[in-house]
């Protein structure tokens, strides 16, 4: 019995030792993973440059009539790739998943009417290349002529958008109406056109394009919810690729390419680099 008891004790101690050893390895691996820091390197000729964008955000990025991705921002990004010898890869994303995709490295940047203001410390940014305002769009025959007329009305706003953030910051105004969160602004304009909502809060650059491309009559209220700037957003710390893109954008501004692309999409040069 004593021998049997001694054997059982020895076996128990061995099991505890093994388990403790396993636990130590798992803890170390978790700590290493938690403390690991992503490293960033410059892109080389032949590398792929993946741009994350919302495919329902014309004229910045969307699906053209030919089924191909197109838009002002995508055209800028492609020109940057062509000049650096990179393979351009436009990657449509769900806007509320952009941060996870950027941090995981599945996309190199967010380039899609991406507002810098209020996000300065969350990403590594290019210099601003476009000014923008958040505004309200209503039906021309709605009888809504100012932001005060929105009291008691319903306003569409895209999820995780700058317009949503601006309205949250302006509770004195936003508390006077109801907001409805939508996945994209194409949905917002369909709701507005059908009368399901009374207004859409959105980027003025996108609003003007949407209004021109639709048969229904809309108007932009003479009220600025917020003023902001667009930039190219990279993962925090990715100065290497950001600097490459910034340098190329400055070259495009100097030789007139930025102005040419802007005029194609907006009828005039509204870019801000080098000005």
Locate the predicted segments by residue:
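Bilobed "Venus flytrap"/periplasmic-binding protein-like clamshell domains
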Residues: 55-58, 69-82, 114, 135-189, ...
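Periplasmic-binding protein-like
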Residues: 55, 131-138, 204, 208, ...
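A ligand-binding cleft/hinge motif common to bilobed small-molecule-binding domains
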Residues: 97, 113-122, 168-169, 193-227
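C-terminal motif of bacterial Sec signal peptides marking the signal peptidase cleavage site
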Residues: 17-21
């Amino acid at each position: 019995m004593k021998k049997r008891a001694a054997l059982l004790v020895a076996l128990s101690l061995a099991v505890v030792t093994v388990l403790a050893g396993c636990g130590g390895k798992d803890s170390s691996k978790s700590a290493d993973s938690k403390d690991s820091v992503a490293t960033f390197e410059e892109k080389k000729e032949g590398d792929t440059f993946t741009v994350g964008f919302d495919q329902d955000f014309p004229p910045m990025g969307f699906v053209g009539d030919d089924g191909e991705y197109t838009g002002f921002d995508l055209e800028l990004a492609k020109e940057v790739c062509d000049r650096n010898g990179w393979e351009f890869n436009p990657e449509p994303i769900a806007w509320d998943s952009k941060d996870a995709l950027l941090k995981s490295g599945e996309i190199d940047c967010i380039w899609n009417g991406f507002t810098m203001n209020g996000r300065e410390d969350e990403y590594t940014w290019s210099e601003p290349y476009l000014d923008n305002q958040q505004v309200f769009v209503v039906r021309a025959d709605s009888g809504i002529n100012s932001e005060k007329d929105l009291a008691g009305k319903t306003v569409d706003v895209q999820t995780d958008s700058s317009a949503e953030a601006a309205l949250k910051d302006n509770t004195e105004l936003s508390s006077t109406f109801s907001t409805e969160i939508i996945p994209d602004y194409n949905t917002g304009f369909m709701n507005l056109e059908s009368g399901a909502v009374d207004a859409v809060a959105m980027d003025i650059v996108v609003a003007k394009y949407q209004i021109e491309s639709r048969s229904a009559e809309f108007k932009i209220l003479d009220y600025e919810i917020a003023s902001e700037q667009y930039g190219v957003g990279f993962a925090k710390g990715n100065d290497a690729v950001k600097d490459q893109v910034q340098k190329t954008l400055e070259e495009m501004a100097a030789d007139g390419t930025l102005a040419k692309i802007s005029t194609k999409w907006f009828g005039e040069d509204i870019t801000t680099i080098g000005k």
